[in-house]
Every structure is written in structure tokens, then in C-alpha cells.
Amino acid sequence: ERPLCNECFICDRSGDPRCLCEDHVPQCHEGCHQCEKVDTRSGTTMYQCRSFEYYDCANE
């Protein structure tokens, strides 16, 4: 089961809604194939999953 995304950047609604997620999380979900480190203003290390097909759009 894919995790939900609160801040979707681009959604694909051709089937099940899936999106490129803008959420910053303490660690990427184990199923994420493209996890990128994000620099934050607070200095806290956060990550963002950039796998387009991965997240369900929670805010739809």
C-alpha cells in the first residue's frame, strides 16, 4: 500500500490518482525508489520521495 501525500505537486488522474509528492519527511518510505535529501531552514535533515508513480493524492 502506498502512503498518502498531503502536498501533491503534479497528479496523474488517468487511473488511480498518483502524484509527485512535495511532502518533506524524516525518512523516505521503504518503497520509494528515488529519495532525495532536502535542506531545510531549521537545519533538520528531511527527505522527499521523487518517485512519480508512488504516492496516492490525499488532498484530492
Curated annotation (Swiss-Prot):
GO terms of molecular function: serine-type endopeptidase inhibitor activity
Tissues expressing the protein: Expressed in bulb (at protein level).
Disulphide-bonded residues: 5-21, 11-19, 28-35, 32-49
InterPro entries in alphabetical order: Bowman-Birk_prot_inh, Prot_inh_BBI
KW Lipid biosynthesis (keyword) present: no
Matches recorded under SMART domains: BowB
SUPFAM superfamilies xref list: Bowman-Birk inhibitor, BBI (SSF57247)
Keyword Disulfide bond: yes
Site residues, Reactive bond for trypsin: 13-14
Protein's GO biological process: negative regulation of endopeptidase activity
Gene3D superfamilies in UniProt: Cysteine Protease (Bromelain) Inhibitor, subunit H (2.10.69.10)
Organism domain of life: Eukaryota
GO CC terms of this entry: extracellular region
Key words of the record: Disulfide bond, Protease inhibitor, Serine protease inhibitor
Family in the record: Belongs to the Bowman-Birk serine protease inhibitor family.
Function: Serine protease inhibitor. Strongly inhibits trypsin (Ki = 0.22 nM) and very weakly inhibits chymotrypsin (Ki = 1200 nM). Does not inhibit bacterial subtilisin.
Protein name (record): Bowman-Birk type proteinase inhibitor C1
Species in which this protein is naturally found: Hyacinthus orientalis
Species lineage: Eukaryota, Viridiplantae, Streptophyta, Embryophyta, Tracheophyta
